[in-house]
Curated annotation (Swiss-Prot):
It is a multi-pass membrane protein. The gene is nqrE. Keywords: Cell inner membrane, Cell membrane, Ion transport, Membrane, NAD, Sodium, Sodium transport, Translocase, Transmembrane, Transmembrane helix, Transport, Ubiquinone. One of its GO terms (biological process) is respiratory electron transport chain. It is found in: Cell inner membrane. It comes from Aeromonas salmonicida (strain A449). Coiled coil: none annotated. Belongs to the NqrDE/RnfAE family. It comes from the Bacteria. Composed of six subunits; NqrA, NqrB, NqrC, NqrD, NqrE and NqrF. This is Na(+)-translocating NADH-quinone reductase subunit E.
Amino acid sequence: MEHYLSLLIRSIFIENLALSFFLGMCTFLAVSKKVKTAMGLGIAVIVVQTVAVPANNLIYNYVLKDGVLVSGLDLSFLSFITFIGVIAALVQILEMALDKYFPALYNALGIFLPLITVNCAIFGGVSFMVQRDYNFVESVVYGVGSGAGWMLAIVAMAGIREKMKYSDVPQGLRGLGITFITAGLMALGFMSFSGISL
């Protein structure tokens, strides 16, 4: 149990996909203007990541891995396209569910919801799962943790950006300029966790 808790904490803080690996920055910067929208997208990323990482773990370990189906048959060269297909299918299911049950959130997320399909944070989480050779339970924990870490980063950024609306930001830095500086300072803050070994 301690190992899984350590993996969860590590994936949220120490190996944060947004602020340590800078994955998913396009949606991170575009949707972080309001906390409510950022929270909705963060929950969507958690759901997709929690399902995509273990689903791709099963597909990789029981279909694509070298010698799993037939001795001497290595289908691992299909892993990228398979992972993207699974992620795309999960995002489509999530999009239909949000459209039916949460139309306000669906409209608020707009074009950024389908962009989760090509969000490199989701694909990065799946790739790290394969690279680190996680088992199924570890992949579930890592999926939840990496999604929660990305959500923590985007909600914190949205909160800071909402407060900056009332700040006296120099003319040349308004908009994305100060947002990039803020993201860099947040990344420095999260870098302080890198010395912790769990």
